[in-house]
Swiss-Prot record:
UniProt protein name: WD repeat-containing protein 13
SMART domains per the UniProt record, alphabetical: WD40
Organism annotation: Homo sapiens
Subcellular location: Nucleus
Pfam families (alphabetical): WD40
Primary site of residence: nucleus
GO biological process, one term: negative regulation of type B pancreatic cell proliferation
Modified residues (Asymmetric dimethylarginine): 114
Modified residues (Phosphoserine): 70, 74, 79
Tissue specificity note: Widely expressed.
Residues with Omega-N-methylarginine modification: 114
Amino acid sequence: MAAVWQQVLAVDARYNAYRTPTFPQFRTQYIRRRSQLLRENAKAGHPPALRRQYLRLRGQLLGQRYGPLSEPGSARAYSNSIVRSSRTTLDRMEDFEDDPRALGARGHRRSVSRGSYQLQAQMNRAVYEDRPPGSVVPTSAAEASRAMAGDTSLSENYAFAGMYHVFDQHVDEAVPRVRFANDDRHRLACCSLDGSISLCQLVPAPPTVLRVLRGHTRGVSDFAWSLSNDILVSTSLDATMRIWASEDGRCIREIPDPDSAELLCCTFQPVNNNLTVVGNAKHNVHVMNISTGKKVKGGSSKLTGRVLALSFDAPGRLLWAGDDRGSVFSFLFDMATGKLTKAKRLVVHEGSPVTSISARSWVSREARDPSLLINACLNKLLLYRVVDNEGTLQLKRSFPIEQSSHPVRSIFCPLMSFRQGACVVTGSEDMCVHFFDVERAAKAAVNKLQGHSAPVLDVSFNCDESLLASSDASGMVIVWRREQK
């Protein structure tokens, strides 16, 4: 049963940064050996119920030993090492479509527990108020965590010293997406409508473009790093997705869109990086198995418009998709089969394209509810609360920005749970990068970075927030350096 052993390995990988923090080589050897043993045991034919029980017990034991997990990309997750996961995403996995063990005894598809988002806030508060000894949970007395975050106010913490570097290799063509590698301070990638993807290294100085990935015949609309940063997946207006090896830049596989439509966005399934979800111009989302190049059976659904944005919750059981008609759909993701079940629909604003969706399970000490950050062409940045296990959204507040036509994106800051307040960052058509405190009732603006000469389309923090990258519609990528306190 490939699905369960991949979930077990994903749990181990997420805790791997906390094992022997002074011996990163041991952590790497450990996770590789775990991957090997789990793959071997997957062929032993153990009863599915026994495997699921093992997964639950494994998660409970690791949680008791190391404490609650932080959000992916946070400084705690970084923990002195950029090695989080083995290179499992390049292994040949079993296709969910053809795996008879993904079926129950009578041939029915199994579903797994999806958890209750309705109880998520209560659970978070329970962890906060009744945490076990030795666990790492943000509190008002979390001096070490505050020190990691700078022990300063949000305004002071998000003061920037200026530009660290400017990349202009994609000048004259928009750069719709820029992303730091997972748990990495100095590795950056960006994609361009010129049809290429750049991999950049910021240290040692001077920053350099390591390689440019070429192969798409039209603009690259989106890309994503795998959990272990060994591969990237990209989507393009040429109706294909490509799988790239980040180490040498080679194209591992080219996968055509099942509908032969322009591909507009993509995201990895966070628990099983062998699966990638893509959205296209024919209003469809598809779950793709990147090892086989096939669409997963039952992993497709239709929206009301062109699919522009995708985001999973941290456990990988809820997927949100936004389209150019102003709707956001939630889907239940079956971990055992890869099947999508449409759950809820929210009309943000009829006819206003939803260009960005970011999910977060724990925003801050003051905002411990699962949240969704959404950009739509409304001249507003929207923050929603996730209120139940089907992804129902409730508007919490909005922030003024300029966005009426461009595909602007936004992010939650990776260290926000370690300090008083919580910050989000967004691009804007006024050519600025805006910072907002989601907990401040009045005057939520924290900072504004000026330097772009075109609408800012995307922003990305590295894992410790020492650097911020922003890209714009003219092809410029600016890396900003935060002031050291």
